[in-house]
Amino acid sequence: FSYAVDAPLDMRMDPREGATAADLLADLSERDLADLFSRYGEERYSRQIARAICRRRTKQPYERSADLVDTIRHAIPTPAQFGSGHPAKRVFQALRIAVNDELTMVEEGLEAALRILKPGGRLAVISFHSLEDRIVKEFMRDCAAPCVCPPDLPICGCGRAATMRVITSRVVRPGAAELDRNPRAASSRLRVAERTDAPLGDDA
């Protein structure tokens, strides 16, 4: 998982199943790699990195994290290597998310939480990057929407009621005291919503 320590390019949460990061680097096309780094890592230099990976893998497959870090360092402009954070951070994040299908897991976890919450129960979610936070934000917003009919309809025809009420009008970020105690919380974002007494779609 780490770009700071040389290790096998696996990244699977469950080593018994699924493709490894090395498999993705070997099998995905240059375009698919660039899309992956851009979508899941929000990597500015996704195309350059994907091109460099494909060029290098024709000579030798990627097996170790140090090899990938070296490729990334040589693929991006020199000033970007000394910006905030490690230059390989976003690519490693993208690979980890893809290998473990993490965003799907977030979506499924939110749906499961909604099903088991009783009226008045609260769902508090801490995410650590913008992709997760976006999913949480949209999920809570959609659950809090009382009607999904087109705005030009004169009356509501869907009969939908809001199943959640958003408690945090804005995302909650850690304060200075929290960061002093726990510097790793710097990227965390908290959102909270409360279950209403409206039935879910399957129960209506």
Describe each region flagged by the PLM.
Residues F1-A204:
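S-adenosyl-L-methionine-dependent methyltransferase catalytic core, i.e., the SAM/SAH-binding region
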